[in-house]
Amino acid sequence: MADFNSPIQYLKEDSRDRTSIGSLEYDENADTMIPSFAAGLEEFEPIPDYDPTRSTSLYSQLTHNMERIAEEDDINFQHDTREFTSLVPEETDNKPEDDEESGAKPKKKKHLFPKLSSHKSK
């Protein structure tokens, strides 16, 4: 069982970056450990709730912009297929190489990684 008479101490910093020792104190009413600097927060007033009647709020502007961008991305994805067709090999790549049989010089194949192929030893 924990000894609630001795507080748990920890380091804390204030707005001026000064370090001091804070302690956690046992609150018998709440049955929880609360920081000693949190005393007096019972009167804390939260920020007022969002007013949905204001149409110029930052939230509604961001939501509208994100919806518009998502719609544009869907349109671009449906109509722009260049990145997918570039992955399909051309028909000439699938032909067997008959150049050697006809007496023509065989074509030099392009290396997949040209920068790496320029460094290979001779």
Swiss-Prot record:
<keyword id="KW-0946">Virion</keyword>
<keyword id="KW-0899">Viral immunoevasion</keyword>
<dbReference type="GO" id="GO:0044423">
    <property type="term" value="C:virion component"/>
</dbReference>
<comment type="similarity">
    <text>Belongs to the asfivirus structural protein p14.5 family.</text>
</comment>
<feature type="region of interest" description="Disordered">
    <location>
        <begin position="85"/>
        <end position="122"/>
    </location>
</feature>
<dbReference type="GO" id="GO:0039548">
    <property type="term" value="P:symbiont-mediated suppression of host cytoplasmic pattern recognition receptor signaling pathway via inhibition of IRF3 activity"/>
</dbReference>
<keyword id="KW-0238">DNA-binding</keyword>
<keyword id="KW-1188">Viral release from host cell</keyword>
<dbReference type="GO" id="GO:0003677">
    <property type="term" value="F:DNA binding"/>
</dbReference>
<keyword id="KW-0426">Late protein</keyword>
<keyword id="KW-1092">Inhibition of host IRF3 by virus</keyword>
<keyword id="KW-1113">Inhibition of host RLR pathway by virus</keyword>
<keyword id="KW-0945">Host-virus interaction</keyword>
<feature type="compositionally biased region" description="Basic residues">
    <location>
        <begin position="105"/>
        <end position="122"/>
    </location>
</feature>
<protein>
    <recommendedName>
        <fullName>Structural protein p14.5</fullName>
    </recommendedName>
</protein>
<feature type="region of interest" description="Disordered">
    <location>
        <begin position="1"/>
        <end position="27"/>
    </location>
</feature>
<comment type="subunit">
    <text>Interacts with the major capsid protein. Interacts with host IRF3; this interaction interferes with the recruitment of IRF3 to TBK1.</text>
</comment>
<keyword id="KW-1090">Inhibition of host innate immune response by virus</keyword>
<feature type="modified residue" description="N-acetylalanine; by host">
    <location>
        <position position="2"/>
    </location>
</feature>
<keyword id="KW-0007">Acetylation</keyword>
<comment type="function">
    <text>Structural protein required for transport of intracellular particles from the assembly sites to the plasma membrane. Binds to both ssDNA and dsDNA. Suppressed the activation of the cGAS/STING pathway by interfering with the recruitment of IRF3 to TBK1, which in turn suppresses IRF3 phosphorylation, decreasing interferon production.</text>
</comment>
